[in-house]
């Protein structure tokens, strides 16, 4: 499996990152099977978050790592400071509280990658970067990033860090997929647009894409007259996306692969380092993702797929 480098980590990060938002204690045997298969096929990075499944995602990963005694072999990406019913929580106190609980659940003294799950533009980047750097200095975090931040805020944060001798963000985690959303899938989410991608190309900051396959838009399970999934209709149903689906299917036929594999290859063939968060729940889905990650697309093919 191909890898990318992220500043602050000695270990490389595989370009397929196993998602865990379906991990619960009730399906722990499935969790073990998914993670064992993922490592067996060459993956090493697991995505989770403080809010996933009320903490069960982190807890099951922690249990699995302890039972396998393999903490040093995996890269953990967890996220915190997500808003709650009372509003935004991107502040030093919430970051510290979430991180402490996350590490306890993971049964680890540190996380390799830590991302703020959302942004709060009312909080100065100085406050945020100072707080995160305290945790880096204490050894609780190896590398920091931001999920669902605009590239303008990322640049502002890294400019502040550079000017003040601090560690900056070494990765970003917005949504990036071939299907372009009509509106955010969830409140406060950011999807990488043309300007965001241009910024990543300029800075070469790694992008770890969530929902990289657009919620299954390219599986063949959706069509303009199939309206039963209200969220998919709201977020992804558009004339441009149906044309992107048609083009992906055409290119897939030419290359002898599946349409959804083309959609994954699109994410992994950008002009900057990328990795895709995947939700594989069995061996067949995992192998499909690995095959998709090995597809080479030319710059012209990427341009043709996305520009309608």
Feature locations, PLM:
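N-terminal binding-site loop/beta-alpha segment at the start of enzyme catalytic domains
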Residues: 1-74, 137
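Residues at alpha-helix caps and immediate loop-helix transition turns in enzyme cores, especially N-
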Residues: 27-31, 57-60, 91, 124-128, ...
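Hydrophobic faces of well-ordered beta-strands that scaffold small-molecule active sites
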Residues: 14-18, 46-48, 76-78, 111-116, ...
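Short amphipathic alpha-helices and their capping/turn segments at secondary-structure boundaries
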Residues: 1-9, 59-69, 98-104, 158-162, ...
